[in-house]
Amino acid sequence: MKVDRRNFLSGALAAVAALGARGSNCSPASGGGRRTWGERLAEKGMLFIAHRGCQSLAPENTIPSFVCAARLGLQAIETDVRFSKDGKLICSHDESLKRMFGLKKKVSDLDYSELRTLVPTKGNGLTSWPKELLRIPTFGEYLDVCEKYDAVPFIETKGDKAVVKPVLDEVRRRGLSRVAVLSSVSFDHVLEARRCDKEIFIHHIFSKPEQLDELAAQGNAGLSYNYKDLSTVPEGLVASVHAKGVKMCLRAGDTPETVAKMIEMGLDYIPTNVTVPCV
């Protein structure tokens, strides 16, 4: 479907502004009526994950990137969560602020009141959005977007393992344990997530074959392996993962050809950095 860029951005801008005016959701939301991650997989057969939001139209891990992904119908929105200096849960892939903000500081060096004054210097759509809308969002603000649009929160925890429990506490407070996904490159984070929450779907990023049995034993789990070229994926690998009751994805579905190959391989969900190639 062809999307009119100007009209789409106008609608998304209004939606972002409305979220900002409302403020962060302060009362527990009812997640009981929402479809679980497993139900969505069963219904669709394949789910697409907007990696760090819709990076085609807004800088990564910003409220506009999350809203654009949701309004384009992406079933899940991925973000990265870590602590600020004062212990706030914020959305930022990098610990360093150099790449996205041109600042030679770490996220953990600054309180959130300082972080929220920063404006990205890198990314698409820098001039499409008021600067105040591009500030580093809190984890709660990200969840507000996911709840508003009934998108799956696909949450990657970063940094110290201590971040996992407060992330899951907030997910549980909103009634989203059976809807959200907790992912991490760190296997310790994934195991901690299962210890803290028996319901949430856990996903191990760039897993190793020797970790498959332990991951399968956790139940309700998925993984990705680090294959940059799909032609090098061993024959039968997807089937062997599925045989253990574990879901699987590979990175990243950024071209129609790659997506078609991933579907042919029988993968369960596809992260994408190019969510709107038609815009």
Model regions: which residues?
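N-terminal secretory signal peptides and thylakoid transit peptides that target proteins
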Residues: M1-V16
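Glycine-rich, proline-tolerant flexible connector loops at the mouths of alpha/beta enzymes
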Residues: F83-D94
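C-terminal segment of N-terminal export signals and the immediately downstream linker at the start
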Residues: R22-I49, L57, A70-L72
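Structural preference for beta-strand elements that scaffold enzyme active sites
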Residues: L47-I49, A76, V152-F154, V179-V181, ...
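C-terminal active-site rim and adjoining tail of enzyme catalytic domains
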Residues: G11, L126-I136, H203-V279
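A cross-domain feature marking catalytic cores of carbohydrate-active enzymes
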Residues: R52, T79-V81, I155-G159, S184, ...
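Metal-dependent phosphodiesterase/phospholipase catalytic core, i.e.
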Residues: T36-E39, H93-E199, Y225-K228, H242-K244
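Catalytic domains of carbohydrate-active enzymes, especially glycoside hydrolases
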Residues: C68-V81, A221-L223
